[in-house]
Amino acid sequence: MANKLIVAPAPHVQTSQSTARIMRDVVIALMPALVVSTVVFGADVLRVTALSVAACVAFEYLIQKFLVRGAVTVTNWSAAVTGVLLAFNLPASIPWWIVVIGAFVAIAIAKMTFGGLGKNPFNPALVGRVFLLIAYPVQMTTFPMPVNGAFDALSGATPLAAVKHGAAADVLGVQELLLGNMPGSMGEVAALALLCGFVYLLWRRVITWQIPVTVLATMALFAFVVALCSGESGAALWQLPLFHVLAGGAILGAVFMATDYSTSPMTVRGRVIFAVGIGAITMCIRLWGAYPEGMSFAILIMNACVPLINKYVKPKRFGVK
């Protein structure tokens, strides 16, 4: 009875959705992209995804069982979601031991060190991805060509990397960007499948539209202004915005990672500020940074700003005009 009188710090969110149900919906929303990625890159996609999920679940179980010695919560599917998202940020050709290291960093360091689900300030899958990118840059930037392409098993540059090194923004058509028949990480090659997952999450009311739409709109507007200042006109003026929205990890990050409950602001206005920051930082890194992709860094930077956003962007108290 005494435990029922303990009140946790605000905010107090009331919802009929359980954590397990929310996480299962996220996994279901990721399935279309997993299928497309498997078609594009072959069975290695299933190998990497299964290993990543198994490693994340195993590390969380072992830490909760033998180190924390508390309740084991692997049945809430949160570790499985982290495993799938981590896998989606990796090349299909990545060695198995790098996947295990990434899972350890994501779960043990980025999640359980801070107390577990809901207490982590940074998205665990992205922390694992960025760590691997810094520690193993060659393996993380060596991408297999699509299995139905002309250069099976050879490494190729992603569309973002090609544009970074001087290629035109129309290096790939809209169809290729939507269907994913191109080199890249497992989860960034199927824009249409990811958009289907976005619609599903909206329908299930797992996420709201503010963060994904604002992130992508900010990126498109940023790219449009850059193209305009570069003297582009006509169809070329719209190619750069469309390319940056559909290429790389823009949709994956905006829909599935930036919307993480524990690492995003509580208010609608705060989410918009958060999303604008992600979109702007992503474009700055893509256009002028050292890496062709900046979504992971942008989300983690804005994750660090969430406490500040929540502090200064608060809803009005009841009765206050």
Which positions does each model-derived feature cover?
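Structural signature of hydrophobic alpha-helical transmembrane segments
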Residues: 42-55, 93-102, 177, 181-191, ...
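Loop-to-transmembrane alpha-helix initiation sites
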Residues: 121, 125, 242-248, 271, ...
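A generic, well-ordered mixed alpha/beta core segment in the N-terminal half of proteins
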Residues: 78-150
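Cytoplasmic-side transmembrane-helix entry/capping segments in multi-pass membrane proteins
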Residues: 71-82, 98-104, 119-130, 209-217, ...
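C-terminal ends of transmembrane helices
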Residues: 58-70, 107-119, 196-205, 255-264, ...
